[in-house]
């Protein structure tokens, strides 16, 4: 799975919009949406919120966790803890990117929020790299990585898979040295 596929999954997350149009309930395969009434909040998938915003049909309400004080607390906790802390959304990075790219005018203190989420991401990726380093140096057979998001797993997944394959090959060659040194006379 690549980053665009993770972003696609994130677009299914529900967000609140305040429409400026009227429309009865819309029946889709993935569920019913609406009804849409001017100035009345309604929950819709992120992909629809972005589409409506691009057509100037709504205002997007940022998620509750997308607040400077809450994000500062999350960032500080992430820096304090040795383990990964739970994130406010399994798609926090993707939601932030999409909302700030398409609806920054609807998000108070958008630049600060962008910086705080990036700081949190950088801290978590640094922890992930340290975990991978100690995993490889300790010649571990398994690892427990709780509270990672799909994008974080996607970022480090290929490296971990390749590392495990190389470690397996090295271990098997060390356990059977005579098999690797056979020569025909």
Curated annotation (Swiss-Prot):
Keyword list, A-Z: Chromosome, DNA replication, Nucleus
Ranges in coiled-coil conformation: none
CDD domains for the chain: GINS_A_psf2, GINS_B_Psf2
Family the entry assigns: Belongs to the GINS2/PSF2 family.
Function: Required for correct functioning of the GINS complex, a complex that plays an essential role in the initiation of DNA replication, and progression of DNA replication forks. GINS complex is a core component of CDC45-MCM-GINS (CMG) helicase, the molecular machine that unwinds template DNA during replication, and around which the replisome is built.
Complex and partners: Component of the GINS complex which is a heterotetramer of gins1/psf1, gins2/psf2, gins3/psf3 and gins4/sld5. Component of the CMG helicase complex, composed of the mcm2-7 complex, the GINS complex and cdc45.
Protein name: DNA replication complex GINS protein PSF2
Organism: Xenopus laevis
């Amino acid at each position: 799975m690549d980053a665009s596929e993770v972003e696609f999954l994130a677009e299914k997350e529900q967000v609140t919009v305040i429409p400026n149009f009227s429309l009865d309930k819309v029946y889709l395969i993935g569920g019913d949406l609406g009804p849409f009434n001017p100035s009345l909040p309604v929950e819709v998938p992120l992909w629809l919120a972005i589409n409506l915003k691009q057509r100037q049909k709504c205002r997007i309400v940022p998620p509750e966790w997308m607040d400077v004080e809450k994000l500062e607390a999350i960032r500080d906790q992430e820096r304090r803890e040795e383990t990964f802390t739970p994130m406010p959304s399994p798609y926090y990075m993707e939601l932030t990117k999409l909302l700030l790219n398409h609806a920054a005018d609807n998000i108070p203190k958008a630049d600060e929020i962008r910086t705080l989420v990036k700081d949190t991401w950088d801290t978590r990726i640094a922890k992930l790299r340290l975990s991978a380093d100690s995993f490889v140096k300790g010649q571990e057979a398994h690892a427990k990585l709780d509270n990672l998001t799909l994008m974080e797993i996607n970022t480090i997944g290929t490296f971990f898979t390749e590392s495990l394959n190389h470690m397996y090959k090295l271990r098997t060659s060390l356990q059977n040295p005579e098999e690797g040194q056979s020569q025909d006379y």
